[in-house]
Swiss-Prot record:
A Pfam family this chain is assigned to: Ribonucleas_3_3
Organism phylogeny: Bacteria, Bacillati, Actinomycetota, Actinomycetes, Kitasatosporales
Residues reported in the UniProt entry to bind Mg(2+): 60, 133, 136
SUPFAM superfamilies: dsRNA-binding domain-like (SSF54768), RNase III domain-like (SSF69065)
Domain DRBM positions: 174-242
Name listed for the protein in its UniProt record: Ribonuclease 3
Organism expressing this protein natively: Streptomyces avermitilis (strain ATCC 31267 / DSM 46492 / JCM 5070 / NBRC 14893 / NCIMB 12804 / NRRL 8165 / MA-4680)
Record-stated family: Belongs to the ribonuclease III family.
Cofactors named for this entry: Mg(2+)
Bias (Low complexity): 230-242, 250-276
Gene name for this UniProt entry: rnc
Active site: 64, 136
Subunit description: Homodimer.
NCBIfam families (UniProt xref): RNaseIII (TIGR02191)
Protein task: Digests double-stranded RNA. Involved in the processing of primary rRNA transcript to yield the immediate precursors to the large and small rRNAs (23S and 16S). Processes some mRNAs, and tRNAs when they are encoded in the rRNA operon. Processes pre-crRNA and tracrRNA of type II CRISPR loci if present in the organism.
Length: 276
């Protein structure tokens, strides 16, 4: 390749990167120092394949703390009567890999991440753990570049809807306990959890299936066995609750139909008696 062609290719790549960063910054609402944003988007698989570049792991560590602080402060102020244990469970319902990944998907964050070929080939751009880690790294980058107030504003914008939804649904409670109470009410038996783990020791991913009466009603993934089981319990709770609501709705409609039919029959009988 000639030097001119190489220069043209490099310039085109740089222009595409800059355009991509501008798009992401528009979604975030902040313009960040270029090198800092690049680092926040650099997964270690890309760094290792390109000569040991800096990864986003330190920024992820920082962003995790910023996210935790802002969410904890919000919960503390909005739920003055909740004890520490329930506040912790509410926070866990918001700050977990699945919730972070969903927020990341809303930003289409996966399309901006710098991934190695191996991760790229195995669907890494939509992998919950990678999306969650990258989102935390981006929050860390906003904190370093713009300060705590800006990072806090970003966290509020992205996570306040989740906090409100979780509070309204009672997600601050223990999902495993909620599932056990629901299955007892529905006469389904006691839930059990089958957990598998994948990945190296320093980065394990746990997958849990919530089973009741031999039937799997929900699955979940997380960085710990506890998180995976909670996610699976939530998924199963929603599935069983939805099915129960549908049955109740069908029963109510059937009862209404029967009542209307009985009313019509009575009306016909009354009309017959009157004509006689």
């Amino acid at each position: 390749m000639s030097d001119a062609k190489a220069d043209s290719t490099a310039k085109k790549k740089a222009d595409n990167t800059a355009s991509s960063h501008t798009l992401l910054e528009g979604r975030l609402g902040y313009k960040l120092e270029s090198a800092l944003l690049v680092r926040a988007l650099t997964h270690r698989s890309y760094a290792y394949e390109n000569g040991g570049l800096p990864t986003n792991e330190r920024l992820e560590f920082l962003g995790d703390s910023v996210l935790g602080l802002v969410v904890t402060d919000t919960l503390y102020r909005t739920h003055p009567d909740l004890p520490e244990g329930q506040l912790a469970k509410l926070r866990a319902a918001v700050v977990n890999s699945r919730a972070l990944a969903e927020v990341g998907r809303g930003l289409e964050l996966g399309s901006f991440i710098r991934l190695g070929r191996g991760e790229e080939g195995t669907g890494g751009r939509d992998k919950a753990s990678i999306l969650a880690d990258t989102l935390e790294a981006v929050i860390g980058a906003v904190y370093l570049d713009q300060g705590l107030e800006a990072a806090g504003e970003l966290v509020h914008r992205l996570f306040d809807p989740l906090i409100e939804k979780s509070s309204n649904l009672g997600a601050g409670l223990d999902w495993k306990t909620s599932l056990q109470e629901l299955t007892a009410t529905e006469g389904l038996g006691v839930p059990e959890y089958l957990v598998t783990e994948t990945g190296p020791d320093h980065e394990k991913t746990f997958t849990a299936a919530a089973r009741v009466g031999g039937v799997s009603y929900g699955t979940g993934t997380g960085r710990s066995k506890k998180e995976a089981e909670q996610q699976a319990a939530e998924s199963a709770w929603r599935a069983i609750r939805s099915a129960a609501d549908e049955r109740a709705k069908a029963a109510a409609q059937a009862a209404q139909t029967a009542a209307e039919a009985a009313e019509r029959a009575q009306g016909n009988a009354d009309a017959s008696s009157a004509s006689a």
